[in-house]
Amino acid sequence: MIIAITEIMDLIPHRYPFLLVDRVLKIDPNKSITGIKNVTVNEPQFTGHFPTRPVMPGVLMVESMAQLAAILVAKSLDSTKNKEVFLMSIENTKFRRIVQPGDTMHIHSVIDQQRANVWKFSSKVMVECEIAAESKFTAMIKDKM
């Protein structure tokens, strides 16, 4: 099932310039999700990271993995209209390849464990069939205030 940007914006609260998932290519609710982020030179982080050689910041790659996992949570629960997903911890993060404008990040997240409102994920970012980043993280689902 492909999920376009308009539905993504219905599922998570992030907006430009911090919306870091462009499209979901495949989703298996309660299991895994794959999406993409097209990296373009006109994104604001590249004015300072780095002006003469733009490089996608690692923290934004981690954020893209977390956003994709939040979409998976939204599609796995019966209703997320009154729920929010919050990042609790990040573990074993590794950056293995530079990501730069013109690259397409293929992001994949898998649910490792779910207990009540705490979910654990393994995620990775691939560019041209190479691992660019990988991480494990934990998120908490809370009622909206």
UniProtKB/Swiss-Prot annotation:
Keywords: Cytoplasm, Lipid A biosynthesis, Lipid biosynthesis, Lipid metabolism, Lyase. One of its GO terms (cellular component) is cytoplasm. It catalyses: a (3R)-hydroxyacyl-[ACP] = a (2E)-enoyl-[ACP] + H2O. The active site is at H49. It is found in: Cytoplasm. GO terms for molecular function: (3R)-hydroxyacyl-[acyl-carrier-protein] dehydratase activity. CDD domains: FabZ. Its EC number is 4.2.1.59. It is an enzyme of class 4 (lyase). GO terms for biological process: fatty acid biosynthetic process; lipid A biosynthetic process. InterPro entries: FabA_FabZ (IPR013114), FabZ (IPR010084), HotDog_dom_sf (IPR029069). The keyword Lyase applies. NCBIfam families: fabZ, PRK00006.1. Belongs to the thioester dehydratase family. FabZ subfamily. Involved in unsaturated fatty acids biosynthesis. Catalyzes the dehydration of short chain beta-hydroxyacyl-ACPs and long chain saturated and unsaturated beta-hydroxyacyl-ACPs. PANTHER family: 3-HYDROXYACYL-[ACYL-CARRIER-PROTEIN] DEHYDRATASE. This is 3-hydroxyacyl-[acyl-carrier-protein] dehydratase FabZ.
